[in-house]
Swiss-Prot record:
Region (Disordered): 1-44
Protein name, entry field: Guanine nucleotide-binding protein subunit gamma 3
InterPro entries per record: GG3-like
UniProt source species: Arabidopsis thaliana
Record PANTHER family: GUANINE NUCLEOTIDE-BINDING PROTEIN SUBUNIT GAMMA 3 (PTHR32378:SF10)
GO biological process: response to abscisic acid; signal transduction
Propeptide: 249-251
Amino acid sequence: MSAPSGGGEGGGKESAAGGVSSSSLAPSSLPPPRPKSPPEYPDLYGKRREAARVQMLEREIGFLEGEIKFIEGVQPASRCIKEVSDFVVANSDPLIPAQRKSRRSFRFWKWLCGPCLSLVSFCCCCQSKCSCHLRKPKCCNCTSCSCIGSKCCDGSCCSNICCCPRLSCPSCSCFRGCWCSCPDMSCCIPSCFRSCSCTRPSCLNKKKSSCCSCNCKIRWSSCFSCPKVRLCSCCFCNCKNLCSNPCCLAF
């Protein structure tokens, strides 16, 4: 009876050993662990980017082709402009007068003859020895000159023999060797004062002691003794009392 017990014990040990061995061999029978699928390889040569660019270009080319087809169907603008111009030429504007051409010719002749007439109106002849010339602002009135047998226009054909008043001063009576009776001294031509004794207009209503008198000499450059006047062109000044205004006549 002892044998079976021993055998039973031995069998139990074997079974236990077999269970342990089976449990130890179970994990080894499973497949080895595998890593996950690796990521896709990078685009080393840029093929995908180039393919995307090609697609974009093809799309743009398609858009451009569609626009070209649309433009080909449109009528050219030059034809429309020509049609409009032909219509305007054929149908005259009712607001434009029919006598426009004659007015243009009248304006042209008016523009051409206007300056000529204005130039002719300024021409004046002095005496037989004077040639015709354009009047200047300083040209005197030849008809009012009292010097007989002499030239009278100051400026272009004038001699110092005769002194005439300006056109703007008809009441001026300036003659050679006389006293100037002009109401305003600026009315007389400077060549008239070579041998006359004059008084400034601002000193006519004042006392002689408070004003200056100008004694004219023959030479124009003999007039630099007046301290207040530097540009004295025709007079030699003898001043008793210095006036607030220059004592010489400046022209």
